[in-house]
């Protein structure tokens, strides 16, 4: 059911101006738009229209949520390409001042922003009378532990075999090729950044982040790019390395004993945080993350429960003398 209203049902009225000229007035024109007499349509929500909506939402969302949740939990570790993540807990990257503490123009290679960073980067804008590159709290707090994975092939030969960890291909394509660029010019990166200084908490300048690959230095370093994409929740994981499967005959990580070598550079005790390393594969919906499935199941269950409650109320009071139907 719906109520309809039309401006045609009302006759425009009101005094007209004096003959021979237009009278000066601050009153709006006597039109349907300015006098708020446009046609309107307003739905009347009744049990007959609302209850099916709640049940339909519940019947759609609950199966979708169950499917996503089961798919997420069924991701089998160590099959196919394996993704290595580092995880942090109790780290609030979604804080407003933290999120804004960056200069996107500087990160995009703008020479003027390189030497004169945005004031949003304060108090990590300048140090030792030099501009900080990259500036801001996000860059200053970049994760810098080093993780190395080794396989002990057999107990008789305990010499560990290092697992090849790929550094390239861990950042989003749009970030790598659009949002982050080094300053233009043919000079070396060290020359381009000579008038800047490193962030306060960094052990080395931005042009020396990857000593093994010169093309992975500066603002286009993929570890740096991954860190600069802030997380929405205080417990999060970020992609660290990729372990590629070489062929279909051999598993990516064969059965055996492994050990993880960690070069500890990133303290977490001062914010009561925790660090972890995750090895995982991906499915059609990405990596293991049960949140989306739980959200769908929760919304679907609430909608279905509300539908049942309203159905009971409608059945109990539909014969009431006050109304023949419940209007919501």
UniProtKB/Swiss-Prot annotation:
Accessory component of a P4-ATPase flippase complex which catalyzes the hydrolysis of ATP coupled to the transport of aminophospholipids from the outer to the inner leaflet of various membranes and ensures the maintenance of asymmetric distribution of phospholipids. Phospholipid translocation also seems to be implicated in vesicle formation and in uptake of lipid signaling molecules. The beta subunit may assist in binding of the phospholipid substrate. Required for the proper folding, assembly and ER to Golgi exit of the ATP8A2:TMEM30A flippase complex. Residues 2-48 are annotated as: Required for ATPase and aminophospholipid flippase activity. The N-terminal domain seems to play a role in the reaction cycle of the catalytic subunit such as ATP8A2. Component of various P4-ATPase flippase complexes which consists of a catalytic alpha subunit and an accessory beta subunit. Interacts with ATP8A1 to form a flippase complex; this complex forms an intermediate phosphoenzyme. Interacts with ATP8A2 to form a flippase complex. TP8B1:TMEM30A and ATP8B2:TMEM30A flippase complexes have been shown to form intermediate phosphoenzymes in vitro. Interacts with alpha subunits ATP8A1, ATP8B1, ATP8B2, ATP8B4, ATP10A, ATP10B, ATP10D, ATP11A, ATP11B and ATP11C. This is Cell cycle control protein 50A. The lineage of its organism: Eukaryota, Metazoa, Chordata, Craniata, Vertebrata. It is a multi-pass membrane protein. Glycans are attached at residues 144, 261. Residues 49-315 are annotated as: Interaction with ATP8A2. Disulfide bonds join 121-135. Belongs to the CDC50/LEM3 family. It is found in: Membrane; Golgi apparatus; Cytoplasmic vesicle, Secretory vesicle membrane; Apical cell membrane.
């Amino acid at each position: 059911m719906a109520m309809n209203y039309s401006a045609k049902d009302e006759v425009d009225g009101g005094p007209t101006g004096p003959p021979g000229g237009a009278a000066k007035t601050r009153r709006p024109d006597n039109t349907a738009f300015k006098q708020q007499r446009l046609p309107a349509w307003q739905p009347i929500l009744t049990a007959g229209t609302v209850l099916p909506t709640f049940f339909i939402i519940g019947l759609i969302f609950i199966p979708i949520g169950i499917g996503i949740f089961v798919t997420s939990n069924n991701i089998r570790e160590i099959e196919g390409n394996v993704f290595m993540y580092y995880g942090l807990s109790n780290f609030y990257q979604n804080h407003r001042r933290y999120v804004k503490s960056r200069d996107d123009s500087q990160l995009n290679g703008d020479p003027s922003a390189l030497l004169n960073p945005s004031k949003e980067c304060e108090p990590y804008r300048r140090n030792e009378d030099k501009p900080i590159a990259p500036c801001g709290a996000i860059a200053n707090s970049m994760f810098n532990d080093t993780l190395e994975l080794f396989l002990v092939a057999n107990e008789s030969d305990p010499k560990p075999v290092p697992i090849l960890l790929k550094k390239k291909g861990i950042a989003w394509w749009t970030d790598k090729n659009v949002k982050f660029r080094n300053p233009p010019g043919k000079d070396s990166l060290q020359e381009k950044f000579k008038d800047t200084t490193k962030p306060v908490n960094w052990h080395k300048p931005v042009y020396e982040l990857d000593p093994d690959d010169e093309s992975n230095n500066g603002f286009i370093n993929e570890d740096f790019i991954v860190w600069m994409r802030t997380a929405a929740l205080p417990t999060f994981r970020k992609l660290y390395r990729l372990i590629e499967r070489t062929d279909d005959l051999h598993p990516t990580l064969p059965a055996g004993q492994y050990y993880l070598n960690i070069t500890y550079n990133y303290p977490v005790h001062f914010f009561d945080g925790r660090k972890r390393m995750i090895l995982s594969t991906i499915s059609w919906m990405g990596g293991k993350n049960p949140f989306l499935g739980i959200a769908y199941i929760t919304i679907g269950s609430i909608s279905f429960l509300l539908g049942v409650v309203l159905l009971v109320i409608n059945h109990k009071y539909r014969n009431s003398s006050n109304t023949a139907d419940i209007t919501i």
